[in-house]
Amino acid sequence: MKNKLLTAGLIILVLGISLASVLLQTNYALALSSRSAEVAFLSRLSGMFIVGLLFCQIVLLGSYKKIKVFFTALTLILILIHPLLTVYQTKLIYGRLDPFYPFTDMCVLCPLRDQIITLGRLAFWAYIAAIAAVVLKATPWFKENWQKVHALVYVAFFFGVAHMFLIGSDARTPLYLYFFTILTGVVIIKAVRKLRS
C-alpha cells in the first residue's frame, strides 16, 4: 500500500509540474487571442504531458500492469494528437492542409529548427514501434525479441526530451528544468541497468 501511494504521489508530482510549467509560461491574453494561439497552447500542453507520461511508464509503473496499459493508451492518444495539432495550426496560419507532414517529413541536412522537429518525429516512430512490439509479442519472431524492440521506449523518451528542451519554451522554466533533469538522469540510470542485464 505504501509503494502504491508513493507511486501515485510521484505521478501526480510529475504531471503537476508538467502542467504548472505550461500554465506559468503562458501569456493568456496571447494564448486566447486567436484559434492558432489556442491550438499552439494545446500542442505545448500535450507535449509536456507526453514526456511526463513516458517517464511514469518507464520508471514508476513497471509492476502496475493495468495502470501502465492505461498510461500507455493515454500517451499514445497524446502522441497522435500533438502532431495533428501542428497540422491544424499550419492550416490556420498558412491555409494549407498536409496531414502527413508531421509524421513523415524527416530532415537531417536542414536548419536547426527542422532537425529539432525531426527528433520529435523519431520519438513518435520509436514509441509506435515499442507499442507494436508489445501488441505483437505473441507472434513467433516477437515472442523472442519483443523486449529488445520495446526498449525503443527509451529512445522515444530521450528524443522526446531533446525535442522538448530544444524547441519548447515551457521546458526552460527553472522548476521544470531542474526537476526533469533529475528525472532524465533516473531514466538514463534505468536504461544503462537494462542494457547491462
Which residues does each PLM region occupy?
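Membrane-embedded alpha-helical bundles that constitute the cytochrome b-like, heme-associated redox core
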Residues: 1-197
